[in-house]
């Protein structure tokens, strides 16, 4: 008795917890908006933009003053030896070299140095290239958004189609259940044979399995949609959009330009990067100019403790200057590099023709596929309506005693096959619509 009560309480808690979960209502637009904020691919693309911003700031930092501090304390346990003519050493034999150890047992060097770039063509071109790289990251972010919208749209439509399929399967289940009960009554009253009941029973058994499979497929489709949204799988959602034939009226092609495709815009940015890469090699021929300065102190003593006697043992020094570096000859290295980069630029130009032809072909293919899929869907819709009429007439004839049970079973099978064909055609038309809108740059 105790165990039974505990189980009941636990079950009640689960029911209350499930009821407390919020069901998120989502239209297709709301779903895409949610995905653009939560999808992991979008989040990573945003981080790529932050990385690009960091690269720009890193390049700017190289042009700012560079300051370094150095401290060197050494114990010279073996002093280096220098060779001097004997004439410099009193009492040494003339004409010989005398080895003399120079230095102190302890030495120190402390300094602060600063440098400022005045002119470096590579720096300015690199800064411009870094900003262009950031622009490229932004466009790749846009491409990620388009890909996510495409995936979410297809997953959303898959849920709607599976939902409609399940609803129709439920109706078929109820229809066959009624037909089975009626056939059993007719058999009991002597108006039908045992084989008639068996035929309907087979169809009913099949629709039960079909209903279970459709329920599972709807769950899988919803999980896929949540995955594309970047949403936890266990969160509950309810789709608010409905599928009507009007949904295919908003994919008409307007004016199209290659710039509407983000791939074309990315290629334009890649061209600018290639041009900047060439420019960077050219400016390497220019001289570099830097200012520098250093301030410090040195010490040399025979006692390590005296190194810390700042006032008496350390001697100041300082210097400032300007440094110019002029490239003269590098074995034609820059020339060879420049030729390679020009070839790469030519490849980018060739990619324009390749991309334009690819876009033209894609638009043509997607448009034809979209138009054909819509026509196929309309035909299958008409077939489904006709097969429904045939089934209803056949059933009425059978109930009136002027038709056979086999005709009803065949009409039912044709009706369910027509339903399957329609939903397949409907889903294909929806996918073709998404693909076509993406091909003309009208998806995002």
Write out the residue ranges for each language-model feature.
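Sec/SRP-type N-terminal targeting helices
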Residues: 43-47, 60, 107, 118-145, ...
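Small/polar, glycine/serine/threonine/aspartate-rich low-complexity segments that form flexible
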Residues: 22-23, 70-112, 242-247, 292-326
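Bacterial Sec-pathway N-terminal export signals of envelope proteins
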Residues: 20-72, 78, 233, 239-275, ...
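Bacterial Sec-dependent N-terminal signal peptides
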Residues: 1-28, 36-39, 423, 429, ...
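Short segments within alpha-helical structural elements
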Residues: 61, 206-231, 385-442
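Outer-membrane beta-barrel architecture
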Residues: 57, 113, 277-280, 323
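Periplasmic alpha-helical coiled-coil/stalk elements that build and connect Gram-negative outer-membrane
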Residues: 54, 147-258, 373
């Amino acid at each position: 008795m105790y165990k039974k009560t505990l189980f009941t309480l636990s079950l009640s808690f689960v029911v209350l917890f499930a009821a407390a979960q919020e069901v998120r209502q989502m239209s297709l637009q709301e779903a895409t908006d949610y995905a653009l904020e939560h999808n992991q691919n979008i989040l990573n693309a945003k981080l790529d933009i932050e990385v690009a911003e960091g690269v720009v700031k890193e390049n700017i930092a190289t042009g700012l003053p560079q300051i370094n501090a150095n401290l060197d304390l050494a114990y010279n346990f073996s002093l280096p030896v220098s060779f001097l003519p004997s004439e410099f050493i009193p009492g040494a034999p003339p004409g010989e070299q005398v080895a003399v150890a120079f230095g102190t047992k302890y030495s120190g060097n402390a300094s602060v140095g600063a440098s400022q770039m005045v002119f470096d063509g590579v720096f300015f071109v690199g800064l411009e290239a870094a900003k262009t790289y950031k622009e490229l990251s932004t466009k790749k972010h846009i491409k990620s958004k388009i890909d996510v919208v495409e995936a979410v749209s297809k997953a959303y439509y898959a849920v709607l189609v599976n939902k409609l399929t399940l609803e129709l399967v439920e109706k078929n289940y109820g229809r066959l259940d009624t037909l089975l009960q009626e056939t059993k009554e007719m058999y009991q009253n002597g108006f039908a044979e045992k084989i008639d009941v068996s035929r309907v029973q087979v169809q009913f058994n099949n629709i039960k399995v079909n209903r279970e499979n459709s329920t599972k497929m709807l769950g899988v489709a919803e999980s896929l949609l949540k995955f594309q949204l970047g949403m936890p799988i266990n969160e509950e959602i309810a789709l608010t959009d409905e599928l009507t034939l009007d949904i295919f009226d908003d994919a008409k092609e307007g004016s199209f330009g290659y710039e509407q495709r983000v791939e074309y815009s990315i290629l334009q940015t890649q061209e600018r990067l290639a041009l900047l890469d060439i420019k960077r090699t050219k400016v390497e021929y220019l001289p570099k100019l830097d200012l520098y300065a250093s301030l410090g102190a040195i010490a040399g003593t025979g006692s390590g403790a005296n190194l810390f006697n700042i006032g008496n043992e350390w001697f100041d020094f300082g210097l400032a200057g300007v440094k110019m570096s002029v490239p003269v000859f590098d074995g034609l290295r820059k020339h060879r590099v420049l030729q390679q980069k020009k070839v790469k630029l030519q490849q980018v130009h060739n990619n324009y023709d390749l991309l334009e032809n690819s876009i033209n072909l894609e638009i043509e293919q997607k448009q034809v596929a979209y138009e054909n899929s819509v026509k196929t869907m309309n035909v299958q819709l008409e077939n489904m309506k006709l097969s429904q009429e045939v089934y209803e007439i056949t059933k009425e004839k059978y109930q009136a005693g002027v038709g056979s049970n086999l005709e009803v079973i065949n009409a039912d099978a044709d009706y369910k096959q027509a339903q399957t064909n329609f939903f397949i055609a409907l889903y294909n038309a929806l996918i073709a619509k998404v693909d076509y809108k993406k091909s003309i740059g009208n998806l995002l």
